């Protein structure tokens, strides 16, 4: 017989809650074994309670919710886990926002900064921030900019390309030139600002940022984001 704690918990829900003033957001992923349990009211209430603990600043929700966790495990007969959490507090001028996609299968939190308070409250800025949450949910970037990409990740991409059949017997200068294009393509896959904009793929996210800067007369910076995908690493 498989022990309860060894059973795979890959179903569940991603939940996010914002504080009333919009300056704090908590997001959690709570897992269970079956989609059936994940859709029950008891499980959803438990996930919400965990998220509210994180929102309140509780650093170890697993310890704080120990009794409730034991209760939900005994109610469902499944291995329920509080898998991961994040908590954003707005720093400086700007906005934080969240988006839950596919009924709790994907969750995103983003923080975007600007220079002026009036920008932070403008419709153009609000739309940009919302669009960025949709972008991150749909396109799954790993970094904000190419500056954040570790050198070894870039080197790995180059190495894979160098060893591919298309470059066998080609002169080094041709290979090196081609590698620049390959690295740029890699950046457009994994870096948020380099990605094609999901609403208008002929533009990049950088183009959309610049348009908002022009509209608001302000400097806008994507500070950070977190993306949870249910059951993924």
List each language-model region with its residue ranges:
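N-terminal assembly/interaction segments in proteins that build large macromolecular machines
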Residues: 1-233
């Amino acid at each position: 017989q498989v022990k309860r704690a060894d059973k795979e918990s890959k179903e569940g829900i991603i939940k996010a809650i914002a504080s009333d003033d919009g300056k704090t957001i908590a997001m959690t992923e709570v897992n269970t074994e079956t989609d059936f349990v994940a859709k029950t009211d008891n499980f959803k209430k438990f996930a919400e309670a965990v998220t509210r603990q994180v929102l309140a600043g509780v650093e170890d929700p697993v310890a704080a919710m120990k009794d409730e966790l034991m209760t939900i495990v005994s109610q469902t007969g499944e291995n329920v886990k509080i898998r991961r959490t994040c908590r954003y507090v707005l720093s400086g001028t700007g906005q934080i926002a969240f988006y839950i996609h596919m009924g709790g299968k994907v969750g995103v939190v983003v923080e975007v900064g600007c220079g002026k308070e009036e920008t932070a409250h403008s419709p153009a800025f609000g739309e940009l921030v919302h669009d960025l949450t949709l972008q991150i949910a749909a396109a799954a970037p790993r970094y904000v900019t190419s500056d954040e990409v570790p050198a070894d990740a870039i080197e790995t991409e180059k190495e894979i390309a160098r060893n591919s059949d298309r470059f066998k017997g080609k002169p080094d200068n041709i290979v090196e030139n081609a590698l620049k294009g390959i690295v740029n393509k890699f950046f457009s896959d994994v870096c948020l600002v380099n990605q094609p904009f999901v609403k208008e793929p002929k533009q990049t996210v950088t183009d959309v940022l610049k348009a908002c800067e022009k509209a608001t007369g302000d400097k806008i910076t994507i500070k950070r984001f977190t993306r949870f995908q249910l059951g993924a690493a």
